[in-house]
Amino acid sequence: MSNTASLKKEYQDRIVPALTKEFGYKSVMQVPVLKKIVINQGLGMATADKKIIDIAISELSTITGQKAVATVSKKDISNFKLRKKMPIGVMVTLRREQMYEFLERLVRVALPRIRDFKGIESKLDGRGNYTLGIQEQIIFPEINIDNITKILGMNITFVTSAKTDEEGYALLREFGLPFKNGKKD
């Protein structure tokens, strides 16, 4: 738990003053905060093999430290052999301490383990939120490579209270996300 406390303390002691100075906020309440991290795995192949959902739930729960839930389809699509309410993905939403703990492990341990890693893209969604696509779940040290039956990717979305992309980018950069270039393109 000391890592979590240190990341929160770093936010209060270093990141808030840096962003206040950079953007000229009059109050510390204007400084953007990281609200939640949503990890999602879309598993279209789960229509053919039902065990993939259970495997993905256990792996995502191991990675995040929180129970993952299956997401279900909203409607029938006959071309994909998909029925309404059939499980087709897995997701977990992290907030508070678990969010900071996961962010710390992602930045310090998991991202550097990606082969030929040169940084992540710096494109945000227009509202200060950022989604990172990961190709393989094996970059996380919690996953035992010997027990992997299928390589599964995931989307990691960082939801911030930032009003603009520049504010969101600055916040995530201060948290240590390794963007490809020093300034936003």
Swiss-Prot record:
Statement: the UniProt record of this protein carries the keyword Metal-binding: no
One GO cellular component term noted in the UniProt record for this chain: ribosome
Transmembrane segments: none
InterPro entries: Ribosomal_uL5, Ribosomal_uL5_bac-type, Ribosomal_uL5_C, Ribosomal_uL5_dom_sf, Ribosomal_uL5_N
One of the Pfam families matching this protein, by short name: Ribosomal_L5
A GO MF label: rRNA binding
SUPFAM superfamilies, alphabetized: RL5-like (SSF55282)
One GO BP annotation of this record: translation
Domain of life: Bacteria
Record keywords, A-Z: Ribonucleoprotein, Ribosomal protein, RNA-binding, rRNA-binding, tRNA-binding
UniProt keyword annotation of Chaperone present: no
Functional note: This is one of the proteins that bind and probably mediate the attachment of the 5S RNA into the large ribosomal subunit, where it forms part of the central protuberance. In the 70S ribosome it contacts protein S13 of the 30S subunit (bridge B1b), connecting the 2 subunits; this bridge is implicated in subunit movement. Contacts the P site tRNA; the 5S rRNA and some of its associated proteins might help stabilize positioning of ribosome-bound tRNAs.
Subunit and interaction comment: Part of the 50S ribosomal subunit; part of the 5S rRNA/L5/L18/L25 subcomplex. Contacts the 5S rRNA and the P site tRNA. Forms a bridge to the 30S subunit in the 70S ribosome.
Record-stated family: Belongs to the universal ribosomal protein uL5 family.
Protein name: Large ribosomal subunit protein uL5
